[in-house]
């Protein structure tokens, strides 16, 4: 049987509130919306972490950033960590990554050096884009194109943009002669609609008078929310007034522009390629936009930054919507199942095309960036999302519980409401069990001792249990016996602590 191709498209800073088929807002995302109409739309998909590098780590390694190493921006995965590219390349795929990487431990732009598991002829990270610009153009791109007048005066059209050049390379890849025995995995990773918001002037003109209505979320006084949310709001004041209207034409324009670039790539699939290609679209995280008095992203678990778009179009064009919570952590296992690649033990995710039982998913936050203390510095957060509720443990401040069905805007924190004592305890236990299962290195008994949990006891997570096999690393030997860990019973080791 012919193995399928994969076209994996992602954006940066584009939560469900910025995609028309999810939000219902008059934002032009017609290409993404068309993909949703032809495929499977996941309505409760969550990022692994609402910050760039940790989110991408979950996506491209299949394990959480706390496991792989980059628990904050500008930290790279460990050298023993395998990626999507490695798994697929070793399975005989032509693996190609074009665009923003933000996973090499360097700065936002990256080093420009292609990892060995991807095709170096198509690698085009931020540093590669910068190498094509003059010093004047670099200065313009980062700080000088903030208005219609700026764009017109500098004659900026789509050919100047990183997004357009990414799309050019992706289209070129698709136009190359097919190799009969080598299916492809191509990742197309756009920076837009992330800052610096560069797009042709006609897109910016569209949104000059557009105001995004936040509704009641703009009125949240944060009185019953964690302290660090209030500190964040004070340090970075929201631009949204009492009218609840968010005005950011550059952001909206780039959101529109990147949709057209996505359309260019998807429409470049030949009929033969389309018959055998799974198309996957998602984003790394969102932007608060003034909701709950917050801007940017950071140590919060509101849907504005954690609930991301996820659409999967099969070659056969199966159409449906899925409301069950899923995670970026599930994408690599799902793709491996479709490609008939054996999933290694280390990957905790599931094939979300086959999930039928109710489930929960975890979201984490630890620190925004290694070099500075934005959003309070080290603020460890763990979140558990189910069909009906969202529990947020803020280790250093206070916790949150939201009713997802009756309070989708997350205005009412129910953590101290005794009516939900059973719900919060069951979710708390499920989250602690999951942290134990994945061997979250930030696990400690403090996560179990929450003031609202009257039956709380210090919870010990067990003794030495080695990392599950990833299919590449040498077998770990048990400390006590010196034997390969496959011969050691994990449960016995847990009880020994």
From Swiss-Prot:
Modified residues (3-oxoalanine (Cys)): 52
Protein name from the UniProt record: Uncharacterized sulfatase YidJ
PANTHER family for this protein: IDURONATE 2-SULFATASE (PTHR45953:SF1)
Residues the entry annotates as binding Ca(2+): 12-13, 52, 284-285
GO MF annotation terms: arylsulfatase activity; metal ion binding
Keywords, sorted A to Z: Calcium, Hydrolase, Metal-binding
Pfam families: Sulfatase
Post-translational modification: The conversion to 3-oxoalanine (also known as C-formylglycine, FGly), of a serine or cysteine residue in prokaryotes and of a cysteine residue in eukaryotes, is critical for catalytic activity.
CC cofactor: Ca(2+)
Keyword Calcium: yes
Record's cofactor remark: Binds 1 Ca(2+) ion per subunit.
Signal peptide segment: none
Active site feature: 52, 102
Annotated family: Belongs to the sulfatase family.
Name of the coding gene: yidJ
EC number: 3.1.6.-
